[in-house]
C-alpha cells in the first residue's frame, strides 16, 4: 500500500511591526490639540538652538587667525558641530514633534504622508522663525565678528557654478532625507526599539558626512531654515544672490529621497512578499 504523504502548508510568519496609516492631507482637528502646539514650540526651540550653536561655531572658526593648527576647529569641527547638534536635538524632540528641525525633512515626510499639510506648513514656519532667532542671538553676542566673517550665510564658493552648487544641495539633502526614512522605518523601529539612539545617531552622522563633502562648495545648506536664518540676519546682497539654491536643492533632494524610499524600496519589498506567497513551490 502506498502511503499518502500530506504536507502542511508553510505558514508565513506574521509581521512583527505595523505600518502606521497615512496621515490625512488636511487634519483641521490638529489645531484644537495642545500636543500640536507643543510640537511647534519644540521645533522652534530646537531649530533656534541648532542655528545658535552651529553658526557660532562657524563664526568662531573664521575669527581664528593663529597659525597654530589647533587654533580653530576647522572643517572637521564645523561638520561635527552640525552633525552633533542634529543627533542631540533629534534625540530630545523625536517623541514630541518627530525631531524634523529642517523644512526639507518635513517636506519629505509630507510627500510620504507621514504628516498633514497643516502640520507641515506650521512646522516649516516654526523652523524658519527658530533659525532667524538663533542666528540673531549669535549676532547679538558677537556682532563685530559676525559682520566681518560673512554671518555664517550659505553662498556659492568661488570657482563653483550655480549648477554645481544646486547639485551638491540636491545630493546632500537626498542623503539626509533617505537616512531619515531608513532610520525611522517602522520595521527597523520594531526591532531596535530597545536602543533609543539608533534613529538620531545615523541622522546626525549623515549630516556630519554631508558637511564634510559640501562645506567647500556651498557652506552646506541642506536645511532651508538654516539658510534663511543666516541670510535674514546677515542681510547682504551676496547672501541673497543664490539663496534660491538653498530652497530648491533641499526640496528636490527631499522629493527624490521620498520617492526612492516609498515607491522603490518599500514597494519592492511588498511586491517580493506577494510573489513569495503566491509561488506554490515555496
Swiss-Prot record:
A motif (NPA 2) lies at residues 223-225. Induction: Down-regulated by chilling. It is a multi-pass membrane protein. The chain crosses the membrane at residues 39-59, 76-96, 121-141, 163-183, 197-217, 245-265. Expressed in roots and leaves. GO terms for molecular function: water channel activity. Keywords: Cell membrane, Membrane, Repeat, Transmembrane, Transmembrane helix, Transport. It is found in: Cell membrane. A motif (NPA 1) lies at residues 102-104. InterPro entries: Aquaporin-like, Aquaporin_transptr, MIP, MIP_CS. SUPFAM superfamilies: Aquaporin-like. One of its GO terms (cellular component) is plasma membrane. Belongs to the MIP/aquaporin (TC 1.A.8) family. PIP (TC 1.A.8.11) subfamily. Aquaporins contain two tandem repeats each containing three membrane-spanning domains and a pore-forming loop with the signature motif Asn-Pro-Ala (NPA). NCBIfam families: MIP. Aquaporins facilitate the transport of water and small neutral solutes across cell membranes. This is Probable aquaporin PIP2-6. It comes from Oryza sativa subsp. japonica (Rice). The gene is PIP2-6.
Amino acid at each position: 500500500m502506498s502511503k499518502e504523504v500530506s504536507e502542511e502548508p508553510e505558514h508565513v510568519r506574521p509581521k512583527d511591526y505595523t505600518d502606521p496609516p497615512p496621515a490625512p492631507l488636511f487634519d483641521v482637528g490638529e489645531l484644537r490639540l495642545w500636543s500640536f502646539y507643543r510640537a511647534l514650540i519644540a521645533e522652534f526651540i530646537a531649530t533656534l538652538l541648532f542655528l545658535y550653536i552651529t553658526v557660532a561655531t562657524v563664526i568662531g572658526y573664521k575669527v581664528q587667525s593663529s597659525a597654530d593648527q589647533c587654533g580653530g576647529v576647522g572643517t572637521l569641527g564645523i561638520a561635527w558641530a552640525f552633525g552633533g547638534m542634529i543627533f542631540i536635538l533629534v534625540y530630545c524632540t523625536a517623541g514630541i514633534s518627530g525631531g524634523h528641525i529642517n523644512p526639507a525633512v518635513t517636506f519629505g515626510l509630507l510627500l510620504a504622508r507621514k504628516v498633514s499639510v497643516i502640520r507641515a506648513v506650521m512646522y516649516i514656519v516654526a523652523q524658519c522663525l527658530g533659525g532667524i532667532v538663533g542666528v540673531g542671538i549669535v549676532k547679538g553676542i558677537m556682532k563685530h565678528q559676525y559682520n566681518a566673517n560673512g554671518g555664517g550665510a550659505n553662498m556659492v564658493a568661488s570657482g563653483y557654478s550655480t549648477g554645481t552648487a544646486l547639485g551638491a544641495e540636491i545630493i546632500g539633502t537626498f542623503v539626509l532625507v533617505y537616512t531619515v526614512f531608513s532610520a525611522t522605518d517602522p520595521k527597523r523601529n520594531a526591532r531596535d526599539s530597545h536602543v533609543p539612539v539608533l534613529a538620531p545617531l545615523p541622522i546626525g552622522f549623515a549630516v556630519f558626512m554631508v558637511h564634510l563633502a559640501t562645506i567647500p562648495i556651498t557652506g552646506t545648506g541642506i536645511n532651508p531654515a538654516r539658510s534663511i536664518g543666516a541670510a535674514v540676519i546677515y542681510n547682504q546682497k551676496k547672501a541673497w544672490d543664490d539663496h534660491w539654491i538653498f530652497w530648491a536643492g533641499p526640496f528636490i533632494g527631499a522629493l527624490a529621497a521620498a520617492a526612492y524610499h516609498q515607491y522603490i524600496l518599500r514597494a519592492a519589498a511588498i511586491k517580493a512578499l506577494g510573489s513569495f506567497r503566491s509561488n506554490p513551490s515555496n
